[in-house]
Amino acid sequence: MSSFSESAILVRDALVARGLETPMKENGISREEKKERIEEHMREILSLLTLDLSDDSLEETPHRIAKMYVDEIFSGLDYANFPKITVIENKMNCDEMVRVNDITLTSTCEHHLVTIDGKATVAYIPREKIIGLSKINRIVRFFAQRPQVQERMTQQILVALQTLLGSDDVAITMEATHYCVKSRGVMDATSSTTTTALGGIFKRNPATRHEFLSGIR
């Protein structure tokens, strides 16, 4: 029996159908075994880098990294961690834009496994359903907690909300600093990357699109 919620399954299937799911293969390994095996491999990697793991500052580092990967920064790879979603019937007939600004996110670049640090703004036009505001933040965080490219992450959040709300009228914009650009390679400390995903009325109606984009701080 699946440990995934109905919402998690709906979102996952919608992403797979659109070719937007993060590339991953289920391996049937438990969380605890994953942590044990990652710790072993990380111990070998750090030793190859000539670090002395008998030093009291480093001896727990492989364990800490393994726990961080599975339980924290890559926890969004497991749909068992998909947030519990609350939607209610739109009995108040709200039909104006709902926008959540400045949602902080920290993700990890899937190419170099270094930090992506930024903010997202999410909006939707209520139709039949209204979603709990904190659930929007939690959905952003879920998709941030996996190796990512920003373009895909933006689209994943869009499709997740469209699926849960039963409406295409959703918009996302995201601005982030990529440490694969800032701390290595070109070493550009000031640039940021902006991505936008628009659905429904946000895509086809210039006035609605302008209202959304002009309201971003």
Curated annotation (Swiss-Prot):
Reactions accelerated catalytically: GTP + H2O = 7,8-dihydroneopterin 3'-triphosphate + formate + H(+)
PROSITE patterns found in the cross-reference section: GTP_CYCLOHYDROL_1_1, GTP_CYCLOHYDROL_1_2
Its EC number(s): 3.5.4.16
Family membership: Belongs to the GTP cyclohydrolase I family.
Cross-referenced InterPro entries: GTP-CH-I_C/QueF, GTP-CH-I_N, GTP_CycHdrlase_I, GTP_CycHdrlase_I_CS, GTP_CycHdrlase_I_dom
Entry protein name: GTP cyclohydrolase 1
Subunit structure: Homomer.
Single GO MF annotation: GTP binding
Disulfide bonds: none
SUPFAM superfamilies: Tetrahydrobiopterin biosynthesis enzymes-like
PANTHER family referenced in this protein's UniProt entry, alphabetically: GTP CYCLOHYDROLASE 1, GTP CYCLOHYDROLASE I
Keywords: GTP-binding, Hydrolase, Metal-binding, Nucleotide-binding, One-carbon metabolism, Zinc
Domain of life: Bacteria
Gene Ontology biological process terms, A to Z: one-carbon metabolic process; tetrahydrobiopterin biosynthetic process; tetrahydrofolate biosynthetic process
GO cellular component, one term: cytoplasm
Pathway, per record: Cofactor biosynthesis; 7,8-dihydroneopterin triphosphate biosynthesis; 7,8-dihydroneopterin triphosphate from GTP: step 1/1
Residues that hold Zn(2+) according to the record: 109, 112, 180
HAMAP family tied to this protein: FolE
Keyword Ion transport: no
